[in-house]
C-alpha cells in the first residue's frame, strides 16, 4: 500500500475535535443528559479527547463509555485459526436509558459499523437519542446513515483507504489516504 497524502496532521485533528466539542455542547444545550460512547478501538480515544475538551468548555465532566461491536457485525472479523470472534467487551459506566448517546468513531464509510453500534447500544438500554460524531467521513455509504458531527469530509475513491493514526495507539496523530 502506498501513501498518497496526509490529509490531517496533529494540529488539524486537535482543531477538528475542539470544533466538534463546541458543536456537541451547542446542539445539546449543554451536556447534562449526554454520554459519549466510543466504538472500539480508536473511537474510544477520540471520545476521551472530546470529553476532556467538553469538560474544559462546560466546567463539568461528561461520562465516557466503550462499545465493542464485534458480535454485532454482519461482516464479522474472525481469528484465522479458531474461527471465533475476538470480543473485548463493552464498558458503559452509566445507564443510557433516556440519555442522549453520542457515538464516536474515527471513520464513517459504509455505515455498517454504526449500524452494529446502534444494535449493541439498544441491547444495553433505550437512549432518548443517538447522535454520531466522526473524525473523518469518506462517503460511499451502503446504509442511510449520516454523522451529526464531522471533523473533515474526505471524498475518496473505492480504490483508496483512509488510515487514522492516534497518539494512544500509533504514537502520532494523523490521517492519511493510501492507494490499495
From Swiss-Prot:
Transmembrane segments: none annotated. It catalyses: UMP + diphosphate = 5-phospho-alpha-D-ribose 1-diphosphate + uracil. GO terms for biological process: DNA-templated transcription termination. It is an enzyme of class 2 (transferase). Its EC number is 2.4.2.9. Gene3D superfamilies: 3.40.50.2020. Keywords: Glycosyltransferase, RNA-binding, Transcription, Transcription regulation, Transcription termination, Transferase. GO terms for molecular function: RNA binding; uracil phosphoribosyltransferase activity. It holds the Pfam family Pribosyltran. InterPro entries: PRibTrfase_dom (IPR000836), PRTase-like (IPR029057), PyrR (IPR023050), PyrR_bifunctional (IPR050137). A motif (PRPP-binding) lies at residues 101-113. Belongs to the purine/pyrimidine phosphoribosyltransferase family. PyrR subfamily. Regulates transcriptional attenuation of the pyrimidine nucleotide (pyr) operon by binding in a uridine-dependent manner to specific sites on pyr mRNA. This disrupts an antiterminator hairpin in the RNA and favors formation of a downstream transcription terminator, leading to a reduced expression of downstream genes. Homodimer and homohexamer; in equilibrium. This is Bifunctional protein PyrR. It comes from Bacillus cytotoxicus (strain DSM 22905 / CIP 110041 / 391-98 / NVH 391-98). The gene is pyrR.
Amino acid at each position: 500500500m502506498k501513501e498518497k497524502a496526509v490529509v490531517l496532521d496533529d494540529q488539524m485533528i486537535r482543531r477538528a475535535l475542539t470544533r466538534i466539542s463546541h458543536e456537541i455542547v451547542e446542539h445539546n444545550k449543554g451536556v447534562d443528559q449526554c454520554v459519549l460512547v466510543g466504538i472500539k478501538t480508536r473511537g474510544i480515544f477520540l471520545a476521551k479527547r472530546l470529553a476532556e475538551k467538553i469538560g474544559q468548555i462546560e466546567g463539568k465532566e461528561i461520562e465516557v463509555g466503550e462499545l465493542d461491536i464485534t458480535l454485532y457485525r454482519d461482516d464479522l472479523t474472525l481469528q484465522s485459526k479458531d474461527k471465533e470472534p475476538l470480543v473485548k467487551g463493552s464498558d458503559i459506566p452509566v445507564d443510557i436509558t433516556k440519555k442522549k448517546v453520542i457515538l464516536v468513531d474515527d471513520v464513517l464509510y459504509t455505515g455498517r459499523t454504526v449500524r452494529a453500534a446502534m444494535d449493541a447500544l439498544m441491547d444495553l438500554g433505550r437512549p432518548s437519542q443517538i447522535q454520531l460524531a466522526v473524525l473523518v467521513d469518506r462517503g460511499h455509504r451502503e446504509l442511510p446513515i449520516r454523522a451529526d458531527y464531522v471533523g473533515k469530509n474526505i471524498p475518496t475513491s473505492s480504490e483508496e483507504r483512509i488510515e487514522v493514526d492516534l497518539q494512544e495507539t500509533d504514537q502520532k496523530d494523523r490521517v492519511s489516504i493510501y492507494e490499495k
